[in-house]
Amino acid sequence: ALIDGDPVQISMHSNLIYSAFDPRFNVVSLPFLFESVEDADAKLDGEAGEKLKAILDEYGLHCMGIAENGFRQLTNSRQEVRSVDDMKNLKIRVAGSNLLMECYKRWGADATNMNWSETYTALQQKTVEGQENPLPAIDAASVQEVQPYCSMWNAIYDCLFFCINGDIYDSMTPEQQEVIDECGRLATQYEREINRAGDDEIMNRWQNENGVTITNYEDMDIDSFKQAVDGVDEWYQKELEGQGYDDAKELIETFTKEAVS
């Protein structure tokens, strides 16, 4: 509907949603791609983000800014996850992305995909033992009620594209476009601030009201997770090239440049 411009003219969706029709948007979800939220900001506001905006242009969408969904943190009902060994055969609901499924396979998990609307019941009944999502999404679905363990591993990041239908944008005067773009820039910056400000409150509430065990990044064997997915960038590049995306190597290299602290 956003592409057609009727009835939706402006929308905000994650890179995972857009990856359903163009797998190049999965590049944002490469494991341990971003060392920090500052690194994510620098890349998505810079050359890497411009490449994604150019891809959106191919579909008739003008991106006014890139906001944040956040790092996808891991929750489960079995045990505290500190290292890749703790992931073995853990039944985890994973978002519908071939890249994410490949990563969880390499981490040793028993990954499955299901609709998010069905996930709470599946977790409650222990049909699946865990899931991965940014904290606000987990909290909004009350998943903490049935998931006593949360690992803050910052493995995979989600962004949000704030887009307007390209034809509508092109019909505006240059002055109007300038206003739209500035509003988009300010809105996405503000959204990032709000999103990040809520994480500490969410974790404190989960611990105090739900008894959730929070395992912090610095208490985890992050290297064990990184080693398990070593080479997944090359796997992803071959996947893209196999589907005819000749810009795959350049796109990935733009995102995997040295981190900005």
Would you name each region that the model predicts?
Residues 1-39, 48, 56-261:
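N-terminal secretory/targeting leader peptides
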